Structures are given as structure tokens and as C-alpha cells.
Swiss-Prot record:
GO terms for cellular component: early endosome; early endosome membrane; EMC complex; Golgi apparatus; Golgi membrane; plasma membrane. This is Membrane magnesium transporter 2. Pfam families: MMgT. GO terms for molecular function: inorganic cation transmembrane transporter activity; magnesium ion transmembrane transporter activity.
Length: 124
């Protein structure tokens, strides 16, 4: 079928779902105002909801297009071993562990005679 027809089918299904929800809310409001005991939803609202849901799902499945294969070998052909497990979202540049690697004040006070790397300048 034509692609736009599936989108129209989704639209019709969603509007039918909205209408069924409105009908259910209106039925509940009516039973409250009439001070009736709890009554289940009428059969036509339940059937409309189920039919609209099925129609919407059917349209969405066809609108989504072709599914990709689960076999990832075609995508992994051009990937090197170094980039295979590369996850940039796990990169941490400033973490609290760097403070553990710095020397404490006691070791720094004992090495006061040794010039630090900031004091040494290269002359060319």
C-alpha cells in the first residue's frame, strides 16, 4: 500500500482512541451525576477501544518501515578492534581519584630543598 495510507491509518486510530477515552470519561461522569452504583463500561466503548488500539498498532508497524537484521556482522565489518569497545560516554577527565595520587604535605615538607618542576626553567 501507499506510505501515506499507513499514516492516515495511524491518525484515524489515534483519533478513535481519543474518542473512546472521552466516551469512557463521559460515561463515568454520567454515573456519578446520576448517583448510580459502579457500572462497567458499555460494550461499544470497550470494542471501540480495542479496535482503535489494534488499528493504531497495525499502522505504526507498517509506517516504521523495514526492520534491520539482528546479525551485526555487516555493521561491524569496518570497525577496528580499538574502536569496538570504545564508549566515549564513560570518559572521565576530572575525577576525585587524582587527589589520591598527589603527594601529601608531609612528603612535600621533607623535600623543601629539592626544586620543583615549576622552578626549573630550560634555557636555550
Amino acid at each position: 500500500m501507499v506510505a501515506w495510507l499507513w499514516k492516515v491509518l495511524v491518525g484515524v486510530g489515534l483519533s478513535a482512541l481519543a474518542h473512546a477515552a472521552f466516551s469512557a470519561a463521559q460515561h463515568r461522569s454520567h454515573t456519578r451525576l446520576a448517583e448510580m452504583k459502579y457500572e462497567p463500561l458499555p460494550t461499544d466503548i470497550v470494542l471501540q477501544t480495542l479496535l482503535a488500539f489494534a488499528l493504531t498498532c497495525y499502522g505504526v508497524v507498517h509506517t516504521a518501515g523495514d526492520f534491520r537484521d539482528r546479525d551485526a556482522t555487516s555493521e561491524l565489518k569496518n570497525v577496528t578492534f580499538d574502536t569496538l569497545r570504545n564508549r566515549p560516554s564513560f570518559y572521565v577527565f576530572q575525577h576525585s581519584g587524582s587527589s589520591l595520587l598527589q603527594p601529601s604535605d608531609t612528603t612535600r615538607s621533607s623535600n623543601l630543598n629539592v626544586p620543583s618542576s615549576d622552578d626549573i626553567r630550560l634555557k636555550f
